[in-house]
Curated annotation (Swiss-Prot):
Classification of source organism: Bacteria, Thermotogati, Thermotogota, Thermotogae, Thermotogales
Biased composition (Basic and acidic residues): 230-240, 263-276
Record-linked SMART domains: Ribosomal_L2, Ribosomal_L2_C
GO MF terms held by the record: RNA binding; rRNA binding; structural constituent of ribosome; transferase activity
Protein name: Large ribosomal subunit protein uL2
């Protein structure tokens, strides 16, 4: 996969950098692995905005991804295609298992069409294979890591991300998260060996506001440009905030810690990300 740059024939093209999609081998998705996807516009079931700056965008269909893989332990799978997924930054790989079933997984870096992948405790340590953490050597880079055994991968699923196994002690493995946090994870949790593909995603530049709107994101308006009824920074003569910077709901921002204390998972965090 590479990046594509453009000549500045228009203002929107001047700084635009996008993927050349050279790693995509199949343009139409597998119909049996599609599901309808309803837009929320950032609203919850009460109809209230819970995520600002969301709405519009191109229509999408959800690709059903296998984040668990342990139920296919010992069954080899051949990579049929590498596909684009509009719902995530990573590419997805279409697998055909020896028993005839097709499934999507996150496409790891270095996995190509025709490769054979495996999951289970006895799988080989190579990119794309899924194993319990107890079977993966210390120092290995992994992605799609489970937090709870059997729940499916939740950590390191975005393009170019990974966790590193730092140590093992008792029933827990010590993992360095993409954020830099050191955290204990149960050794029975599954993880996929390797790094998530499409690493150049972080270097893409949209070039114009319209491309961002296609992705379903609306303009991010500054608080000082609003009226007092809409934001604590609103109103006044000129552009002054008048007080310490706050969020739209009045909480201090720029350094104020908002993480809820005494969470049950605190005992698994060895070192917080901001202590690195």
């Amino acid at each position: 996969m590479g990046l594509k740059r453009f000549k500045p024939v228009t203002p929107g093209r001047r700084f635009m950098v996008i993927s050349d999609f050279s790693d995509i081998t199949k343009t139409e998705p597998e119909k049996s692995l599609l599901a309808p996807l309803k837009k929320t516009g950032g609203r919850n079931h009460h109809g209230r905005v819970t995520v600002r700056h969301r709405g519009g965008g191109h229509k999408r269909r959800y690709r059903i991804i296998d984040f668990k893989r342990y139920d296919k332990a010992g069954i080899p799978a051949k990579v049929l295609a590498i596909e684009y997924d509009p719902n995530r930054s990573a590419r997805i790989a279409l697998l055909l298992y020896a028993d005839g079933e097709k499934r999507y997984i996150l496409a790891p870096k270095g996995v190509n069409v025709g490769d054979t992948l495996m999951s289970g405790p006895d799988a080989e340590i190579r990119p794309g294979n899924a194993l319990p953490l107890e079977k993966i050597p210390v120092g290995t880079l992994v992605h799609n890591v489970e937090f709870t055994p059997g729940k499916g991968g939740q950590i390191a699923r975005a393009a170019g991300t990974y966790c590193q196994i730092m140590a093992k002690e008792g029933n827990y493995a010590l993992l360095r998260m993409p954020s830099g946090e050191l955290r204990k994870v149960h050794i029975k949790c599954y993880a996929t060996v390797g790094v998530v593909g499409n690493e150049d995603h972080k270097n893409e530049v949209h070039g114009k506001a319209g491309r961002v709107r296609w992705l379903g994101r609306r303009p991010h308006v500054r608080g000082v440009a609003m009226n007092p009824v809409d934001h604590p920074h609103g109103g006044g003569e000129g552009r002054g905030k008048g007080h310490h910077p706050t969020s739209p709901w009045g909480l201090p921002t720029k350094g104020y810690k908002t993480r809820r204390g005494k969470r049950p998972s605190d005992k698994f965090i060895v070192r917080r990300r901001n202590e690195v």
